[in-house]
Swiss-Prot record:
Family affiliation: Belongs to the PsaI family.
Listed GO CC annotations: chloroplast thylakoid membrane; photosystem I
The name this protein goes by in its record: Photosystem I reaction center subunit VIII
Record keywords, A-Z: Chloroplast, Membrane, Photosynthesis, Photosystem I, Plastid, Thylakoid, Transmembrane, Transmembrane helix
Species whose genome carries this gene: Gracilaria tenuistipitata var. liui (Red alga)
Database matches in InterPro entries: PSI_PsaI, PSI_PsaI_sf
Length: 36
């Protein structure tokens, strides 16, 4: 029963969090490069 509604929560969550993390890391990398 738990497996049926788990993907519907997990897929949007991963779709939001993963780009968010990658954008944050990219932003930090660019900022670090500009400072130095």
């Amino acid at each position: 029963m738990t497996g049926s509604y788990l993907p519907s929560i997990l897929v949007p969550l991963v779709g939001i969090i993963f780009p968010g993390i990658s954008m944050a890391l990219l932003f930090i990398y660019i900022e670090e490069e500009n400072i130095s």
